[in-house]
């Protein structure tokens, strides 16, 4: 099923698989979202939950409050990006997707949760709202959440990657940890100014 929001400026499509964006086209038909060429990266815009990035050996070790010496296996970027979400169209400019913890997720991440993702289309802007609802009464749940959209670059055949740049409205003063792309792990002690 094609899930779509459309206005005069953009046509945006979504997938129940991962509750994610699958296409962003302007009024001229230019595709802005990466279309998942597996030669480079098969993803498009996965939702990352309950982790962003990687864990050493994919192991999540939970404290005694959860289960004594319990270890779960959480792959890079979490448990939901390759799961089917329930879809609900709210109105002509808003769709939502929902995923509820199940037997499979509870084996690796011992928390009951509902993850709602709400997408809104306004002019040439798409906003994403994440809602993590805990069903846990006695404890809070640890998590990270994030979006990982891939964008086409270059957009036109006569352009090259080097024609593009990012411009920030403010000078950036943070430092970033050294990363190891093969594992997705970070060295928090070795930082580079950004």
Positions of PLM-derived features:
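Beta-strand-rich N-terminal accessory domains
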Residues: 1-61, 66
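Acidic, contiguous internal or C-terminal segments within carbohydrate-active enzymes
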Residues: 5, 101-149
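Residues that act as N-cap/strand-start positions at coil-to-secondary-structure junctions
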Residues: 6-8, 18, 54, 79-82, ...
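Short, hydrophobic/aromatic beta-strand segments
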Residues: 23-25, 139-145, 177
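Extended, loop-rich substrate-binding clefts of extracytoplasmic carbohydrate-active enzymes
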Residues: 70-123
């Amino acid at each position: 099923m094609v899930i779509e929001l459309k206005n005069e400026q953009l046509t945006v499509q979504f997938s129940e698989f991962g509750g994610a964006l699958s296409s962003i086209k302007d009024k001229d038909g230019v595709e802005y979202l990466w279309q998942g060429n597996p030669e480079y990266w098969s993803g498009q815009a996965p939702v990352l939950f309950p982790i962003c990035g990687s864990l050493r050996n994919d192991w999540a070790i939970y404290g005694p409050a959860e289960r004594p010496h319990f270890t779960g296996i959480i792959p890079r970027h979490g448990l939901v990006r390759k799961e089917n979400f329930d879809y609900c169209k709210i109105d002509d400019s808003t769709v939502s997707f929902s995923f509820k913890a199940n037997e499979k997720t509870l084996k690796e991440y011992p928390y009951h949760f509902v993850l709602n993702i709400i997408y809104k289309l306004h002019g040439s802007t798409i906003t994403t709202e994440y809602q993590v609802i805990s069903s846990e009464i006695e404890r809070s749940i640890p998590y990270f959440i994030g979006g990982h959209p891939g964008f086409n670059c270059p957009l036109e055949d006569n352009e090259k990657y080097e024609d593009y740049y990012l411009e920030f409205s403010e000078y950036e003063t943070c430092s970033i940890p050294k990363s190891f792309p093969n594992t997705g792990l970070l060295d928090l002690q070795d930082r580079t100014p950004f």
